[in-house]
Amino acid sequence: MTRAERTALLSAALTHLDAAAKLLEEAEEEVLADEARELTDKVDVVALAEAA
């Protein structure tokens, strides 16, 4: 394998790793948003219970 071929393969691998990292970040943001919604729902339930 030539140096140019290795460089091309490494470049492609880095591109895929970067894309995977972005997908992981998006997934983490979605999980955090879901957790925030769940906490908000729990706070709402507690507030309703206290108001009753």
At which residue positions do the language-model features occur?
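Short, charge-rich amphipathic interface segments used for partner binding and complex assembly
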Residues: 8-52
